[in-house]
Amino acid sequence: MAQAKEIVPAPVVVEEAPVQVVEKEVIVYRDREPQGFRPNGYVDLQYRYYGEAEELNYKNNGVSNNYGRTQLMGRINMTENQALEYRIRSYNDWNSSSNDKQKGEDGTQTRLRYFYNHGNVGDSSVNLTSRIEYRKEAESDAQSLEYQARFNFADYLFNNDFVKTTEFTIAPKYKYYWASNSDDYQNRLGVDLFTMHQFPFGFSFEFNLYGDQYFYGQRQYTNDHSTVKNNTGLTMEAYLYNTTNLYTNDKFDIDFYFEGGYDPYNWNSEKVLKTAINEKGDLNDPTNYTYNDNTYEWYAYPQIITTYKVSPNFNVYASLGAEYRNWANINQKSAKDWRWQPTAVIGFKTTF
């Protein structure tokens, strides 16, 4: 009897695959260090033309008043705490300056302001900023230098959907004023109030008070034969602003802009505010003036402003408008002769 053979399976050899070690790049994310302060600011250059105010010409007022004004203004934030503002206005007479019948505005006005932000006072939310201002007037070449300690209490006032206070500053000050005559100088001590409030629908309201105690180096006339050495003055400014967009796209904006109000109202303890009776007469003759203790100017200035965005940091603009103001008589008791004066503006603004 045949026996079955036992079949023994052959051994299976299993080859182990080689182990590969793959090193992956490990990216370590670190917080980016904040960049240091970079100086920034803006530059605005414009030309403004003032047309003849209605009826205020040589025939009716003895002098034409159409002129142009080139204005260069801007701000440089030099450090986190320091800033410089500048405004230079150069007036050019559109008439013949040698002809008294066609005399307009002329000269250059310069204003420079340096700010130093000291931060909040103690643990309060009151900001303290020092401001030094230098100013040179266009007509008389009079100059002034002023220091203010500006305490801003805006964080303690309104901040809701209806009204937001962006500035409420109380500023003690000292000012030194001097003219070409060595005796014609003034020392002024006082306190100013600056406020700004924003409202819905593009409205805002600015209200300012300037309180001054004047100490004159040269006695000031209060009529044709009386003079004073000291005076107390209070000046009020009140402006209403509104900006309403009429059309906009990626490049163009057309806005209706309005501003108006008291610009300014002046009160004095002495009648040192004088107005020439005859602008072509002797301006050094005290009998050629009327003297008042209160004056005011009120105005309204609607405009249409068109802005073209050349780039994110460069805009050009133009506006047409007219200013309504009591040009001829600003005496509080007899203010009158409100007249329209057309204006046109073209300019550009760049930020950096």
Residue ranges and their predicted role:
Residues 46-70, 92-103, 285-292:
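Surface-exposed strand-loop-strand hairpins of Gram-negative outer-membrane beta-barrel proteins
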Residues 1-42, 79, 311-313, 332, ...:
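Cleavable N-terminal export/targeting peptides
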Residues 45-57, 76, 80, 88-94, ...:
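Transmembrane beta-strands of outer-membrane beta-barrel pores
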Residues 63-158:
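Outer-membrane beta-barrel channel domains
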Residues 64-70, 104-110, 141-149, 183-191, ...:
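Residues that define the transmembrane beta-barrel architecture of outer-membrane proteins
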Residues 71-75, 111-115, 148-154, 192-196, ...:
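Outer-membrane beta-barrel architecture
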Residues 31-41, 77-83, 119-128, 153-169, ...:
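Short loop/turn motifs that connect adjacent beta-strands in outer-membrane beta-barrel proteins
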Residues 212-231, 238, 261-352:
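Predominantly the C-terminal beta-signal and adjacent terminal strand-loop region
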